[in-house]
């Protein structure tokens, strides 16, 4: 094991060494590994950005819309939307985007969704313009 201090503290382990490494936290390119960072658009409509992958959207405005635009997310990206206050929020599939609601079992139901107050929905992208949505308080 060695510490390559030239590019920050990068630890590499090889061979058959045994021991313990104590760290105060783990961070990767998207942020802290043991917590989910938030995007907080406030009381306004919001359009997903590539930087939202691995985050949750804290939607607070009554009657607001979170839009999924075409060619924004990548295969494997996950975004969760939380409706933390009263009222509904619309989750809108943008032009050229197909959003399947997993609840029907056949995965044939597409279209905009409504997330009720205190609801939570997760989107997983299987391509830049295709995603599946599932959650509580989702219709």
Language-model features, listed with the residues they occupy:
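Extracellular jelly-roll beta-sandwich "head" domains, especially the C-terminal globular C1q domain
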Residues: 108-139
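Exposed extracellular interaction/assembly regions and N-terminal maturation sites
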Residues: 27-95, 128-139
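Right-handed beta-helix
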Residues: 1-16, 28, 98-103
């Amino acid at each position: 094991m060695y510490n390559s201090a030239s590019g920050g503290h990068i630890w590499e382990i090889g061979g058959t060494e045994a021991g313990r490494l104590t760290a105060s936290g783990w961070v990767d390119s998207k942020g802290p590994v043991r917590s989910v960072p938030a995007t907080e658009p406030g009381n306004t409509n919001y359009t997903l950005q590539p930087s939202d992958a691995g985050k949750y959207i804290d939607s607070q405005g009554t009657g607001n819309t979170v839009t999924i635009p075409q060619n924004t997310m990548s295969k494997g990206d996950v975004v969760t939307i939380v409706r933390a206050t009263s009222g509904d929020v619309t989750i809108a599939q943008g032009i050229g985007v197909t959003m399947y609601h997993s609840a029907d079992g056949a995965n044939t139901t597409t279209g905009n969704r409504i997330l009720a107050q205190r609801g939570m929905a997760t989107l997983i992208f299987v391509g830049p313009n295709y995603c599946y949505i599932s959650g509580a308080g989702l219709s």
